[in-house]
Amino acid sequence: MKSSGPVERLLRALGRRDSSRAASRPRKAEPHSFREKVFRKKPPVCAVCKVTIDGTGVSCRVCKVATHRKCEAKVTSACQALPPVELRRNTAPVRRIEHLGSTKSLNHSKQRSTLPRSFSLDPLMERRWDLDLTYVTERILAAAFPARPDEQRHRGHLRELAHVLQSKHRDKYLLFNLSEKRHDLTRLNPKVQDFGWPELHAPPLDKLCSICKAMETWLSADPQHVVVLYCKGNKGKLGVIVSAYMHYSKISAGADQALATLTMRKFCEDKVATELQPSQRRYISYFSGLLSGSIRMNSSPLFLHYVLIPMLPAFEPGTGFQPFLKIYQSMQLVYTSGVYHIAGPGPQQLCISLEPALLLKGDVMVTCYHKGGRGTDRTLVFRVQFHTCTIHGPQLTFPKDQLDEAWTDERFPFQASVEFVFSSSPEKIKGSTPRNDPSVSVDYNTTEPAVRWDSYENFNQHHEDSVDGSLTHTRGPLDGSPYAQVQRPPRQTPPAPSPEPPPPPMLSVSSDSGHSSTLTTEPAAESPGRPPPTAAERQELDRLLGGCGVASGGRGAGRETAILDDEEQPTVGGGPHLGVYPGHRPGLSRHCSCRQGYREPCGVPNGGYYRPEGTLERRRLAYGGYEGSPQGYAEASMEKRRLCRSLSEGLYPYPPEMGKPATGDFGYRAPGYREVVILEDPGLPALYPCPACEEKLALPTAALYGLRLEREAGEGWASEAGKPLLHPVRPGHPLPLLLPACGHHHAPMPDYSCLKPPKAGEEGHEGCSYTMCPEGRYGHPGYPALVTYSYGGAVPSYCPAYGRVPHSCGSPGEGRGYPSPGAHSPRAGSISPGSPPYPQSRKLSYEIPTEEGGDRYPLPGHLASAGPLASAESLEPVSWREGPSGHSTLPRSPRDAPCSASSELSGPSTPLHTSSPVQGKESTRRQDTRSPTSAPTQRLSPGEALPPVSQAGTGKAPELPSGSGPEPLAPSPVSPTFPPSSPSDWPQERSPGGHSDGASPRSPVPTTLPGLRHAPWQGPRGPPDSPDGSPLTPVPSQMPWLVASPEPPQSSPTPAFPLAASYDTNGLSQPPLPEKRHLPGPGQQPGPWGPEQASSPARGISHHVTFAPLLSDNVPQTPEPPTQESQSNVKFVQDTSKFWYKPHLSRDQAIALLKDKDPGAFLIRDSHSFQGAYGLALKVATPPPSAQPWKGDPVEQLVRHFLIETGPKGVKIKGCPSEPYFGSLSALVSQHSISPISLPCCLRIPSKDPLEETPEAPVPTNMSTAADLLRQGAACSVLYLTSVETESLTGPQAVARASSAALSCSPRPTPAVVHFKVSAQGITLTDNQRKLFFRRHYPVNSITFSSTDPQDRRWTNPDGTTSKIFGFVAKKPGSPWENVCHLFAELDPDQPAGAIVTFITKVLLGQRK
């Protein structure tokens, strides 16, 4: 039967003459029938020259093709009649515009299709499409583009899309870019937000929350607002966002939202359900479960021990199965396994063991690759993404249908699964552990690109449409192949038209108002805009999303607790515009910290911007400094994008010196560390708390959980004397890129820096020096005033105009490694009591109050019901993750922050014995001090000691003191050689009265080797106006102690490396006690001895130098009267946090400080066992009755340890229900100083720093400083072995991998004798014989780690002797994420590897923290 009507026309359009499935024949091409036409309303584009036809042109009567009159003869396309009008919609071969929930076509056609709703031409269109624009709802549009379109056509379609959106919605639409950033998106659309993530992946959970919150904020601000979701490639991203927002909007949905929810569900089922990956479905389920409360959130970190994957022997014919794993945390690579090889038929399951266990928290992605037989390619076996907040057991299993890539791979068995084994501790799991078959071998030494590539390191690092005239490429593959993709820019790019002028403010929401289910010809009435959610709905949303990192105007749960209360910033309200576009995310801020749980938002001050989640921001100094690039290091390397993410984010104020940031300065960033912003500048606008906080400020201390930081009067940094400038920051997981080389080297004012090449005839040919002299308004106690660095041995100059001697910015080093049995050096005569090494087998434990069992203290009657104190639980011993390669990129306290008020030079707490031969000739330089009145310099003879320098900055000419040189001491049997250092030129100033104001009667106890004598120091004679014979007593309250002893002289261009008294096999020792440097008040002067001051020892005399922990330089000259406990108030608690919070203190150090104190004395430190928690060490009167027998000092048993856990509500002592949450550590300390609650006794708040309470000691002879060693540098000759690329790996594992590669390669590398020099600028290698190279320099900011081989392997020399192997890890030039380990072996027995490594780690790397 012959068809008629619409069906006949449909079949004709499809090229079929009847209803049978006969093959269609091509129609005969017919000539065009052109006629002249004037184009007025919408001029088309010429079909030949692609230029818009302005005015008159020609148009074909049949096919409607348009062209210029002059181009008419050049038309080559055939003329074919268009299909009927009712069938034209959804059949265009180029782009498809579809309306779900709408019945009108985009061109306002009144004609409607009579086809049934179920009929679809989608299968015909899947072959070729360039744009798929779908109205998901009336206010949510989805714009999808193919993955790899022609770039020029793609730009044209983007312009058409922008034109359509502008014509329909004007500036009322907000475009969410879910793919890589593009310049033209920002250029063509008024408001764009970038929330991109890699294709076929699930977005981070907090990013999912952020997108939904931003959509909600935009749509609720104005009923006419529209959201456009832009996606390029797989449409699964659209499904993830639409599904997530569907669940999000149901929280506060009304009756008018039911239809929108239905259409969103219909879109997901019909359009994107088949394109969703298993991980994307999993994250949608996570999001829905967290919103509904069906998923209980687990906020504790997990340690991954094993990954069990199935064996796939037939994965690649001829090659077998060679898998390896890559583990990412928040899209940053944290682990790469070795390549596993299976010989013959092996077991059904392969066990990949992670040693040590890998700490994971947050979004985790595990990818398994198969290394190809040729070794140059790799194939993705499976990929799985999950979030640790949803894991509540020790095992996590994923079957095949939940594994990305594997779920559609027939080579992956249907019954196979992937299993992860976790625990809450890094210790090995006891009991039966999975083991591999003996036929399984592992290759850890591979350096092939297929294994090393990190496919995600360059995502969103640049704009996708960036064209700079050169080849654009990605350094790593994005599809699993080992090769980068190179794209040539188009030869001719048409100019992008400028956006249309802003339209009138009032327009209709949309012309698409009727819903397709009605099938009516008349549009229905417009649905009113959604009202903004009520306060109750917002609170409910906050409660549900509290743990996800984003709340409805509140701060997330991931933010760590501050030592001092935050001056919280209020939230943004939903208004007609958000003021953060383009490029920034709206509506995400922090709550005031006054209330527990989830609170309502407060008002917001002006002048802030939101730092979007999942973005990478170029770091700026909040106090007005600027990033600078050191000499000899490219600026691009200085601005390495440090991947950071925080589960909480808030409003950031613009520093006054910077102004508003430029748009588009954000890229993708993966999590790792919490952001810290300094808000102490008095010039910043005040941030007011909510009214409830202001009322609580008037309450007594005991009633406050959140305490406010009071400011003192003053100017500049002196007004903040003694106050922490940063809140403590908690790293969430171990990362391989850890030291400030990742973009944290800041110069105060690069505008004032100048490069000075070496003058003719001067030494220092190894590099040129540079000078920085910032203005006073950029002053910071931790920054140099005028510091001259040089590769040679230049002496820093002093800038009297700046009023401050240069300070080195240092912090306690945290170098630790794997101690090996019997690895102590013969020189290790003693160990500093300040930093005892951890015994290998010792377990650490905390006392956690619980309801039943464990250690019990007799409690007062009114506290008896609170529950006894619980037994201690065993924790892990300290591992290498706590060292420089562990968690310490950002400072944990105000005292060791980068560029903070720290003057410590990171001298080791164990004795550092210096052997420094120096030639007699001078090698110093003079630098311009830029003083209003040039201060004359004083030349000291080698026999004179350098007098102290006044820091008053008055420019007064100094009086030249006279005196004898230092007295020699008796020889020490263990002292290595130390020839004299070179003389120095110093501008000298003397304070009135003959000696400096800051001298303190208290002094630290030097830690020396047994048998080393201490002689009284005979300083220079007093000046004429002081009593005769009274020396200027230089008590270095902030400098290391030095003890001298004579040795036969030696001669060498630079000092040798100081020999450490005690170091492990990898050359690293325990961190010193953290220093406390208090800024002087407006009327005070700092201590008399700056870091750069030192006496110049006499020629021919060697000196034995010993460093001790650094102490405060703000010691009062007269002791203050004791403060009564009852007089404590808010300000007192805030000001004393520097006395009891010691972040880098070890447990043994805390015991040593507290064991001689009265009961109630306490210290709080960062927990090394539980990341993000604190440890409370408390001295008690008697041990608990159930305490275990103690073999050591019984006094040490009186120091008990408690764990302070952190959470969304604040901090609390773990294990006791009666313990409330406190807004800060200060609040917790204040309350427990009044009432012990669950503690054995009340806390006694100290009135002074316990590190300063040391007995007086004789002043050692010949004061010298670590700064002298840095200026002169230390050098020796070593054997250079090789350099091994370690991808993103650093720390001891990088050195171990490089050592394994060097020792296993055949033939072994030929060593070369090189001159190894360490100075303030970095490490310089000079091959005197020029066999391998001439000279190589590694700037200090590129060096991330240094140690000896953790496995204590040795290099075998040709004569049969062996030498210890050591190395340092530095950034690979031109690659911000890859590292290279440079390997060496000892050459001179007097310069052991441990001494070199200790010098690098403790002095060189520590001075820039």
From Swiss-Prot:
The gene is TNS2. Residues 491-506, 968-982, 1046-1056 have a biased composition (Pro residues). It comes from Homo sapiens (Human). Belongs to the PTEN phosphatase protein family. The modification Phosphoserine is found at residues 118, 120, 455, 466, 481, 820, 825, 830, 832, 835, 845, 931, 941, 972, 991, 1003, 1247. Residues 1140-1247 form the SH2 domain. InterPro entries: C1-like_sf, C2_domain_sf, PE/DAG-bd, PH-like_dom_sf, Prot-tyrosine_phosphatase-like, PTB, PTB/PI_dom, SH2. Induction: By high glucose levels in differentiated podocytes (at protein level). Residues 299-425 form the C2 tensin-type domain. Ubiquitinated following sequestration in cytoplasmic aggregates with SQSTM1, leading to proteasomal degradation. Residues 1275-1408 form the PTB domain. This is Tensin-2. It is a peripheral membrane protein. The modification Phosphothreonine is found at residues 91, 474, 910, 977, 1182.
